[in-house]
Design a protein with these regions (language model features):
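Small cysteine-rich, disulfide-bonded extracellular modules of the LU/uPAR three-finger superfamily
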Residues: 1-162, 171-203
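Generic short beta-strand
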Residues: 164-166
């Protein structure tokens, strides 16, 4: 007689995509996008992810993703133009290297229009996706340059050149962290950020 194991493995995979649009009404329609700036996988803070899952199962406070954070410490451009990437922060009391801006993405807690989360599942499969969306409109963040073709922008020091993003709970646990080639946010650009977390069960 074969005894069925009560154990299974949980794996979380993440993927980030940043798409630029010119008009807010086009957001979500990739056929009208200006360009895709980032399309890559992310790193997961395994300890904090385990805390998040346990809280969600027990229906406890801070058991969901609450904010998407943007930073400027994920990459450095050297004098020769080479991009040096920082190692994603996935252990201990981790945070973004240089956090500068965030968006609330929990649409059950007054997230701005366009920011939302959704769960997607295909019957019969052993994975489910959490799709987390944030839209940074033309007037966000305050103080950015009017156009992205303005000269003199320092890719290493500007507060509006993002090169790292992380997802956090409301009590500030960093669950994911991804670094990427610097992307400048200016007032002529609308960014849609789609962050997908795939929760996979392996028996």
């Amino acid at each position: 007689m074969t005894q069925r194991s009560d154990e299974f493995k949980v794996k979380i995979e993440g993927h980030l995509k940043i798409t630029e649009y010119e008009n807010i009404e086009d957001v979500g329609d990739e056929s009208k996008a200006c360009r895709v700036h980032v399309d890559k996988r992310n790193a997961v803070h395994e300890e904090n992810a385990s805390i998040l899952i346990a809280r969600a199962i027990a229906n406890r406070e801070n058991g969901s993703i609450f904010t998407m954070h943007f930073g400027t410490g994920g990459a450095t451009v050297d004098p020769l133009g080479n991009i040096l990437f920082a190692t994603p922060n996935t252990t201990g009391a981790a945070d973004l290297n240089t956090p500068v801006y965030f968006e609330v993405v929990d649409d059950n807690q007054a997230a701005p229009a366009g920011n939302q989360m959704a769960v997607r599942h295909i019957n019969g499969t052993l994975f489910s996706d959490v799709e987390i969306r944030a839209v940074i409109d033309k007037n966000e963040p305050f103080g950015q340059a009017a156009f992205d073709n303005v000269g003199g922008v320092n890719l290493n020091t500007s507060l509006f050149v993002f090169d790292e993003i992380g997802l956090k709970t409301e009590d500030d646990l960093l669950v994911t962290h991804v670094v990427f080639t610097p992307v400048e946010k200016s007032a002529n650009r609308i960014f849609e950020i789609v962050y997908v977390l795939r929760i996979r069960i392996a028996t």
